[in-house]
Structures are given as structure tokens and as C-alpha cells.
Amino acid sequence: TNLYGCNAAKAADIDGDGDVDIFASVFLPYIRKETPGSEFTESLIWMEQVEPGRFERYSLEKMTCFHPTLDLGDFDNDGDVDLVVGNMTMAKRKEDTLAHWAVLWKNKRR
């Protein structure tokens, strides 16, 4: 699959079905909210493996392409895999940054 500007990707069994799924994030700091077409630019996706070697793509976020890193782990200690995404928080233009250094996406599966 194509993900323009993909800067980080991690694999784990995110949905608890025994196979490996993928999260991927985008870092394109020059894409701004006022850039034509930016509202369609995916910045965070989940690739669910539905059968061996076949993935379904889910867009979790668009138009926020300021993620230089991501990681997976059980950050809330509930037994499933959560996602934390690092954000660019310093730039020349305040509107080209995100407010928080990192954002935790809790897995609501349990």
C-alpha cells in the first residue's frame, strides 16, 4: 500500500486475533492545513491483517502530518496493544505544530 511521507511503522497483534497488524505514521512538516488537498492526506493508518498477507487499511487521522515517530505497547496495563504517536511541537509557524509531545491512542478492544 502507498502512504506518502510514511516515516514510522510498527507491527503487533493489535486486534488480538493472533496475526500481525501494522500502524504507520506520516511526517510531512511542509504539508499545512491550507495546502490544497491536505484534508485528504492520511497521517496515521492501521493495516489490519484479515488473512495471511492480505490487509485492510483504516485511516485513523488525516491532515496532521507531524508525526516523526510512533511506538506500540500496553501503556494502560489492560493487556492489549496501545499506540503512542510522537508529534512535532516546535516550528517557525505555531500552526505547523501540535500542542502535545505525544498522543496516546488507547486500544478499546477490551
What are these regions (language model features)?
Residues 1-110:
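Beta-propeller-forming repeat regions
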